Regions:
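Bacterial N-terminal signal peptides
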Residues: 7-19
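Hydrolase catalytic cores
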Residues: 254-257, 276-284, 346, 412-483
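Subtilisin-like serine protease catalytic core
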Residues: 36, 42, 60-61, 129, ...
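Structural recognition of the beta-strand scaffold that forms the well-ordered cores
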Residues: 47-50, 101-102, 108-112, 129-131, ...
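Protease zymogen maturation seam
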Residues: 21-24, 69, 73, 124-186, ...
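Inhibitory N-terminal propeptides of secreted protease zymogens
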Residues: 23-145
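C-terminal subdomain of the subtilisin-like protease fold in secreted/lumenal serine endopeptidases
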Residues: 99, 164, 308-321, 375, ...
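Catalytic-core segments of hydrolase enzymes
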Residues: 253, 307, 311-419, 463-466
């Protein structure tokens, strides 16, 4: 008996002395090493708890249904999966007085706790992944020149203004001349916020009726004071009830997509579209949860209290000029991937910057969401249609497959647009390229309702009609004449060519599945 007691005591001591980390392999719950690091030595941290039960998005994505129904049906499926799986876990967390925030776009929760809580969650059969939710510094562009003051009031359509070079390059004014400005399309920006009353943006804000502003269902702030930000403060504050841009970057990229102009020159691709926005960064610092929360808001916008979601008010197209560092910061790959797949299944087009890591050479598209097959990834060219040295290249190899990226390229070098405090400036980076494609989709979907919310068909149309560009860099083994290739993708965005192919019904030859 004494020997048995000694064995039991020894086993207990071994269990206490041993790190919790190895338990994850036995329990089949994948716990990221960063989570153990963040909660070591009695520390607490935010982390993502992703449940094993997820909605069957793949089936919904290919199921035949009207465009108007797609967003509603995908939303309902996601909500039902979360409502069925989360109650027992939420009850346990509440009983333990643990702070958490639940999501449905991915069946997951953001939880704040210590290592003992992580160890407990790793024993639950309903949990599949536990991943970090660290704040990280986003690689955002800064102004190339001193900002200038707005010169005069702008017009709602901007068609009377002189277009900036980048708009002429992608042939946006050619569609304006045909009466196509993006009317009827909801354009969404997830970024550092937006100065909603900027003269180049106010009239296009969906929350502005010309007299008063209503930010319900048009704005959401995913930067919460209750979550861990490593001591970061914010010039705008937290949990904002009205749009604010704490950096300027969000105002700039929104201007490229839907801005009017400075009274002399036009800046936006689709100035007739209406925009909504969500802040997913705190002064340039993002978190996986803030990125996911904004995508959820765009799928089913809510009131300012975060309740009464309404998928009928969802975005049509989302412009994403950010990356979530997977290697350097441990950004959660599983949760972000599931979120962008859900967005696509809902018929929402997602234009994403390829990243500014071109200095690393080939296969420098290394961060989500730009590396995902389910998003449309955009590289940066200059006014001579030459790839920018900083623009990240493909192929994507980080997940063990050889995915051709980017999909195509668009202007991103010295692009003039709106900036904070009613000013304008130029910036350079792939952040400037992605809104060109998002704006292009707004124009095409406004012109062709049969194309709206058909993400795959739209991607194919953009790729087929892009201006072919070649590279001798040889990324992914590409020949110097290869099109597509891993530097330019299918080539330079050409909105007029896309429009002409659609309106001349050439899609019946090249894209038979497009005919409605």
């Amino acid at each position: 008996m004494k020997a048995l007691r000694l064995i039991i005591i020894s086993l207990i001591l071994i269990a206490v002395a041993s790190p919790v980390f190895p338990a994850s392999a036995v329990l089949k719950v994948q716990v990221s090493p960063e989570v153990w690091q963040d909660t070591a030595n009695g520390a607490t941290a935010d982390f993502l708890v992703i449940l094993r039960s997820q909605a069957d998005i793949n089936t919904l994505a290919v199921a035949p249904m009207a465009a108007a129904q797609r967003g509603e049906r995908v939303y309902q499926a996601l909500r039902q999966a979360a409502n069925a799986a989360q109650p027992t876990l939420q009850a346990e967390l509440q009983a333990r007085q643990v702070l958490f925030r639940s999501y449905w776009i991915v069946n997951m929760l953001v939880v704040h706790g210590d290592q003992a809580l992580v160890a407990y969650l790793a024993t639950r059969p309903d949990v599949e992944y536990i991943e970090p939710d660290r704040p990280f510094k986003a690689n955002l562009e800064t102004p190339d020149t001193t900002t200038i003051k707005v010169q005069s009031p702008t017009t709602p359509t901007a068609v009377s203004l002189t277009p900036q070079w980048n708009l002429n390059t992608v042939h946006a004014p050619d569609l304006w001349a045909r009466g196509v400005t993006g009317k009827g399309i909801v354009y969404a920006t997830a970024d550092t916020g937006v100065q909603w009353n900027h003269p180049a943006l106010q009239n296009q804000y969906r929350g502005w009726d010309g007299t008063t502003a209503d930010h319900n269902y048009n704005w959401w702030d995913a930067v919460h004071a209750s979550e861990t930000w490593g001591g970061l403060t914010n010039i705008c504050g937290f949990d904002l009830q009205a749009p604010c841009d704490d950096y300027g970057h969000g105002t700039h990229v929104t201007g490229i997509g839907v801005g009017t102009g400075d009274g002399v020159t036009a800046i936006g691709v689709a100035p007739g579209a209406r925009w909504i926005a969500c802040r997913n960064m705190n002064g340039g610092f993002g978190k996986p949860s803030t990125y996911i929360e904004c995508l959820q808001f765009f799928m089913a916008p809510t009131n300012l209290q975060g309740s009464a979601p309404d998928p009928s008010k969802r975005a049509d197209v989302i412009s994403n000029s950010y990356s979530c560092p997977q290697i350097s910061e441990g950004c959660a790959p599983h949760s972000l991937r599931a979120a962008v797949q859900a967005v696509r299944a809902a018929g929402i087009f997602m234009s994403v910057s390829s990243g500014n890591e071109g200095g690393l050479g080939c296969s420098s598209i290394i961060d989500p969401p730009g590396l995902e097959a389910s998003v449309f990834t955009v590289g940066n060219t200059d006014s001579s249609n030459v790839i920018a040295p900083s623009s990240s290249r493909g192929p994507v190899t980080i997940d063990g497959y050889n995915l051709l990226k980017p999909n195509l390229v668009a202007p991103g070098t010295i692009v003039y647009s709106s900036w904070s405090n009613n000013t304008f400036t130029t910036l350079t980076g792939t952040s400037m390229s992605a809104p060109h494609v998002a704006g292009a989709v707004a124009l095409l979907w406004s012109a062709f309702h049969w194309l709206k919310n058909d993400v795959f068909a739209t991607e194919l149309l953009l790729e087929i009609t892009a201006k072919p560009l070649t590279s001798s860099q040889g990324c992914g083994g590409d020949s110097p004449t290869a099109v597509p290739n891993n530097v330019y993708g299918y080539g330079l965005l050409d909105i007029l060519a896309s429009y002409n192919m659609a309106i001349s019904k050439l899609e019946k030859i090249y894209l038979p599945f497009l005919t409605k």
